[in-house]
Structure formats: structure tokens, C-alpha cells
């Protein structure tokens, strides 16, 4: 997939007729017949631009409205429609957009802390929804979104587009058919460079173009304590979920998909921290999360630091069996490796390739097709699957937040009884050593071991009382997610 930089987008937006990837021509609408599905895109930075690119290429679909709490971002997005711009309605407040009768669906690409609330609002307004991953900022609100989709009979697709590729669909079915024996471990990797976001001395100004009340939504309307309002919200717990819930949810979802596990694990444990620099972020940039499923362990790794200081190009990031961002599914008779979104390679125990799987991205088209058919069982990324995989990310972060720092020696002793965690955390410590990280300031955080109840998405055991409040959040009125009974 092509991810364009913010700089290139702003440059293109300055001159609407420029011959660039974000020229007016690229967002000209594909002609359709009567009965076009009318879509509004909500959140127009980053993934929102990708949504626009996908939607405007689909026949029988028209983007009719745009919404963003930042008026400058909104204006630039509208300008990119060129001659079609006059037909595009714009909104700063999503609630006004949802009151419009001439919109069939909304495509949500706002910050994580807004996803569930906005998707629930859309369901209540009778709109179908495509919502970016993670579908929630916490476990509880994700479950309310699942209930809202059922109660209001809406089509709700999660932005886990890897599930739409024929190649991965075939690979999952092939493994489940037993061609490599039972799965022994499902691994996901997010080795993706993340630089420091800087450290400020005091409150920063909110851009004049931003309606900060709407931007904050359910989160506290607090002073901005980082350089950038946009994007860097990922690295602050109050609005984001770190890379485990940003890039990582894709690979977390694929690992669970291969395992065939429909619900949450029996136990979850995290080891990690924000290491290598001191900045205004508070989410881990280095992390191992292990989910103890009955079938096999799901092991997930995040690394935001390079393979070694100064590393660039293809050698910039560590690789596990050739994978920086992807999955390794270990089985009794071999393994399946995915190193991009839509292809996979199966090998036997000797490393000989026995089968390859290739596919393409059909995710947005699938959403539109199901909107027309109303057969929600045909969704590739149904909201329930999106909720469960998002919850896996949240559980890892809950374990981390409640944990405490340990020296490498004590950590090694603590994890030695858990072979998969000991192996992964050992490699993590080695990686940090190559980056010159002093693991005494700050130390790695050994998270609390969380035990999940068999049903109900609640905790049991020693740390249940401390962990339970983190399944949800305090909501700022009027941006409150309420309990929904399907």
C-alpha cells in the first residue's frame, strides 16, 4: 500500500491543479447510475485520505460529505475534489452530518478515542459504518459498538483490510485444514521506526482552525502537552493506544484469525516500556504482549527503535525470520510467514517453500457490496471480529499500565517459567542493548498478569480490582458512550 507523507499532501493541497497523487483528478468521482451509495468521510488526515482514495474509485459510490474538527484540514480535502468540490458538503460537527437524510454511510478515520462513539452515533442515525482500527479506545466501548450494530441492524465493517485479501483467506483455510499440523505459536510483529515526539516545557497552542471540544470528544479537554496535536495523539494513552493498537492491531488480528479463537484469551501479560528517549509520549515503543489461548500462545512484539543506531534503508529495523511488520505462524510441520498485507508463504520444517498465497485489497468494495445485499455474514471485517482484536491490544496496554519496572536480571528470573515470553523478551533486551538503552533508567515494565473470565469480558484473580476500571474510561459529557442492549 502507498502511504503518502503529510508533507507531500500539504504541498499538493496548496496547488489544487498540481500533477501529484493528491491532485483534484485523483479524487474525481467515478460515474455511477441512479441508486449510488452516498458516503461521508469523517476524519481527513492520514487514513481518511486513504478512505477517499478508495471510495472515489468505486463504481456506484459517491462521496457527498466531509467532516473534520480542523477547518483547515476540511478545506484542503474539499479542494482536492476540483470541479466536483461544489457538490461536497462539509461539516465540523459529526452530529450535524448524521442528521442529513441524503447520506447512506459514514467512513470513520478520526483518532482512536473517537471511533466507537462516532460509530455508535452513526448506527443510531441509521447509517452504515466503515470504522478504522482499532474500533475502540477501550474494551467496554467496543462491545457497545457491537451491540449498536445489532440493535440498529447496521452494516459495520472494521478497517482490518488484511482480511479481505484472497491470499490470506486461502492461507488461513489451508492451515486450518491441517496441512502443517497444529499451530504451536501465532506471532505478530510491528518493528516500525518511531522517533521521539519531542518534549515541551509547557502548554502548547491549539491551532485556531481546530474545534478543540469536538476534537477531544470523550477525552479530557486538557492543555496540549506535546508539539503536534495531530497524529502524535497515538502515543498518549488518553487518546491513543500506542503502536500495538495502531499498526499492530492488523498483525494481532491476523494471528488470532489463524488461531481461530473467537474470544479473549485466558491470560494476558505485557513486558515493555517507552525507551531510548524521553519525550511527551507515554505509550510503549518497545513491547512484548503474550495472550495465552487454549489452542496456542499469541505473541506480539513492538519495536520502535532501529536495529542499531544509525541503521537505514532495508536494514533499518530488526527482522524476525525476514519479517519486520507481519506474522509468523509456527506449526508442527512448518510455518506460514506474511511480510505484507496480502501475500503469505508456507514452508516445511526444513525451510522449503511448499505453497504461496497471493491476493489484493477488496475491503472497501466488500463493505459496499454488503451494504447493497444486507448480508452481514459476508463482511470480511465484521465489527465483532474488529472488537475482539482491538480488545487484545487494550489488554496488553492494561497489563503494562498496572506493571512496575524491573531490572533485566529480575525480569529474566520472573519470565523463565514462560518459555515463549522468556524467548521474546530476551530478544527484546538484546535489541535494546544494541541501541545503548540503559535499562535502569527507566527500567522495563513487567506488566501484571491478567486473568480473563471465561465469559463477559471481565477480569478475575489477583489484579481484577485494579484492572477492571481500565476496561472503560471516564467520559466527558456530552461525549458519553452509554450501555446498549441489542
Which sequence ranges carry the predicted segments?
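Alpha-helix capping and helix-loop boundary segments enriched in small/acidic/polar residues
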Residues: 73, 109-113, 136-140, 159-162, ...
Amino acid at each position: 500500500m502507498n502511504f503518502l507523507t503529510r508533507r507531500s499532501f500539504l504541498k499538493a493541497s496548496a496547488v489544487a491543479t498540481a500533477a501529484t497523487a493528491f491532485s483534484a483528478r485523483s479524487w474525481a468521482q467515478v460515474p455511477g447510475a441512479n441508486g449510488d451509495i452516498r458516503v461521508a468521510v469523517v476524519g481527513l488526515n492520514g487514513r481518511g485520505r486513504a478512505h477517499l482514495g478508495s471510495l472515489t474509485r468505486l463504481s456506484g459510490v459517491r462521496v457527498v460529505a466531509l467532516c473534520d474538527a480542523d477547518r483547515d484540514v476540511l478545506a484542503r480535502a474539499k479542494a482536492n475534489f476540483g470541479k466536483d468540490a461544489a457538490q461536497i458538503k462539509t461539516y465540523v460537527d459529526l452530529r450535524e452530518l448524521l442528521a442529513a437524510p441524503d447520506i447512506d454511510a459514514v467512513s470513520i478515520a478520526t483518532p482512536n478515542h473517537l471511533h466507537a462513539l462516532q460509530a455508535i452515533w452513526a448506527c443510531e442515525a441509521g447509517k452504515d459504518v466503515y470504522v478504522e482500527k482499532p474500533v475502540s479506545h477501550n474494551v467496554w466501548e467496543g462491545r457497545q459498538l457491537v451491540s449498536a450494530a445489532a440493535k440498529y441492524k447496521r452494516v459495520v465493517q472494521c478497517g482490518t483490510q488484511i482480511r479481505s485479501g484472497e491470499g490470506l483467506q486461502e492461507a488461513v483455510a489451508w492451515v486450518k485444514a491441517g496441512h502443517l499440523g497444529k499451530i504451536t505459536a501465532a506471532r505478530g510483529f510491528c518493528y516500525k521506526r518511531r522517533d521521539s515526539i519531542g518534549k515541551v516545557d509547557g502548554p502548547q497552542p491549539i491551532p485556531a482552525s481546530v474545534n478543540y471540544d469536538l476534537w477531544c470528544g470523550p477525552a479530557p479537554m486538557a492543555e496540549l502537552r506535546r508539539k503536534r496535536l495531530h497524529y502524535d495523539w497515538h502515543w498518549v494513552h488518553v487518546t491513543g493506544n500506542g503502536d500495538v493498537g495502531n499498526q499492530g492491531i492488523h498483525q494481532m488480528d491476523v494471528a488470532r484469525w489463524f488461531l481461530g479463537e473467537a474470544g479473549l484469551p485466558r491470560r494476558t501479560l505485557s513486558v515493555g516500556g517507552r525507551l531510548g528517549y524521553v519525550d511527551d509520549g507515554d505509550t510503549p515503543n518497545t513491547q512484548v504482549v503474550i495472550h495465552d489461548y487454549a489452542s496456542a500462545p499469541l505473541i506480539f512484539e513492538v519495536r520502535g527503535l532501529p536495529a542499531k543506531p544509525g541503521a537505514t534503508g532495508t536494514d533499518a529495523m530488526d527482522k524476525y525470520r525476514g519479517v519486520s511488520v507481519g506474522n509468523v505462524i509456527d506449526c508442527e510441520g512448518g510455518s506460514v510467514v506474511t511480510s505484507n498485507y496480502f501475500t503469505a508463504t508456507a514452508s516445511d520444517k526444513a525451510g522449503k517453500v511448499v505453497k504461496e498465497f497471493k491476493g489484493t485489497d477488496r475491503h472497501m468494495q466488500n463493505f459496499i457490496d454488503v451494504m447493497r445485499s444486507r448480508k452481514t455474514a459476508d463482511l470480511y471485517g465484521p465489527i465483532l471480529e474488529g472488537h475482539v482484536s482491538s480488545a487484545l491490544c487494550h489488554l496488553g496496554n492494561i497489563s503494562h499500565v498496572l506493571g512496575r519496572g524491573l531490572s533485566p536480571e529480575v525480569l529474566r528470573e520472573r519470565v523463565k517459567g514462560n518459555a515463549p515470553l522468556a524467548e521474546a523478551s530476551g530478544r527484546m533486551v538484546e535489541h535494546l542493548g544494541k541501541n545503548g538503552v540503559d535499562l535502569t533508567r527507566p527500567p522495563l515494565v513487567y506488566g501484571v498478569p491478567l486473568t480473563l473470565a471465561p465469559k463477559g469480558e471481565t477480569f478475575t484473580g489477583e489484579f481484577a480490582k485494579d484492572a477492571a476500571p481500565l476496561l472503560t474510561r471516564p467520559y466527558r459529557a456530552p461525549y458519553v458512550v452509554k450501555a446498549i442492549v441489542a
